[in-house]
Amino acid sequence: MNTVKTVRELRAAIARARGEGKRIGFVPTMGNLHSGHAALVTKAAQRADFVVASIFVNPLQFGANEDLDKYPRTLAADQERLLQAGCNLLFAPTVEEMYPDGMAVQTRVSVPNLSEGLCGASRPGHFEGVATVVSKLFNMVQPDLAVFGEKDYQQLAVIRAMVRDLNMPIQIIGEPTVRAEDGLALSSRNGYLTAEQRATAPVVYRTLQQIGDAISRGQRDFAALVADGQAQLAAAGLRPDYLQVRHALTLRPAMVDDRDLVILVAAYLGNTRLIDNLYVHLDEKTA
């Protein structure tokens, strides 16, 4: 696996792969990689002949009081994990390489509607930063396909909409959330948790499961289910940011006759913000 730091080197390496008739897969990351990221690379390697990953902690998607400065940078360990997962090329640019004229004058990409509410409400500007950097990376790599984790459900929806609306010829593949044995969704930010907090954290997924089970049994009072779930999270010592039931494709608030639902949650455990989601499909008997 080669590592390059400039757009020129990146494009030269991809041009060579294209010249050999290879199908290009792409996995954008912010580094501090775990088994969930490895699963994305493995999926890309299954679908493509040449896998490109990027590591870039994107300042545009961090708010003023978020963890940009303390977000872990673990390049050597990340390179080893990417190599083991089947990555062929790593693009690890600097901020100056990505935003040579500075971020203040950078053209922005905004995806309306899907970027609003949920994480977009508590992290204003976040999805504009995500859409902007991903569109730049897509233009640099020009992949045939790109793989994103379903843990960041709203982000995946935003990327799908951007690709569709801007006519980008890229297949977007969602990879199921990778979880620890106790159900906690793997996240680079889990490393911020104390041992006691880590023992508490699986309540997030258990809460989603309980709401999902109730919906599958025919419960349609979504407001009551959400209220119970928020109370359960609070009783465990978490501060819910949001807990909502939405239509799985459009992310509008769920209606009683919807068959494809997603339950989405964000909650603070100490200073660490945990997010997760659970997809629920209802057949005709339960819908």
Curated annotation (Swiss-Prot):
Alphabetized GO MF terms: ATP binding; pantoate-beta-alanine ligase activity
Residues binding ATP: 30-37, 149-152, 178, 186-189
GO biological process: pantothenate biosynthetic process
Binding-site list for beta-alanine: Q61
One Pfam family per UniProt: Pantoate_ligase
InterPro entries: Pantoate_ligase (IPR003721), Pantoate_ligase_C (IPR042176), Rossmann-like_a/b/a_fold (IPR014729)
UniProt key word Ligase: yes
This protein's pathway: Cofactor biosynthesis; (R)-pantothenate biosynthesis; (R)-pantothenate from (R)-pantoate and beta-alanine: step 1/1
Enzyme class, UniProt record, top EC level: ligase
Disulfide bonds listed in the record: none
Keyword presence, Acetylation: no
Taxonomic superkingdom: Bacteria
Any GO CC annotation of this UniProt entry: cytosol
Residues forming the catalytic site: H37 (proton donor)
UniProt keywords, alphabetically: ATP-binding, Cytoplasm, Ligase, Nucleotide-binding, Pantothenate biosynthesis
Residues where (R)-pantoate binds: Q61, Q155
Annotated compartments: Cytoplasm
Annotated EC: 6.3.2.1
Entry similarity comment: Belongs to the pantothenate synthetase family.
Quaternary structure and partners: Homodimer.
Database matches in HAMAP family: PanC
Function: Catalyzes the condensation of pantoate with beta-alanine in an ATP-dependent reaction via a pantoyl-adenylate intermediate.
Additional free-text comment from the UniProt record: The reaction proceeds by a bi uni uni bi ping pong mechanism.
Official protein name in the record: Pantothenate synthetase
Organism: Pseudomonas putida (strain W619)
Lineage: Bacteria, Pseudomonadati, Pseudomonadota, Gammaproteobacteria, Pseudomonadales
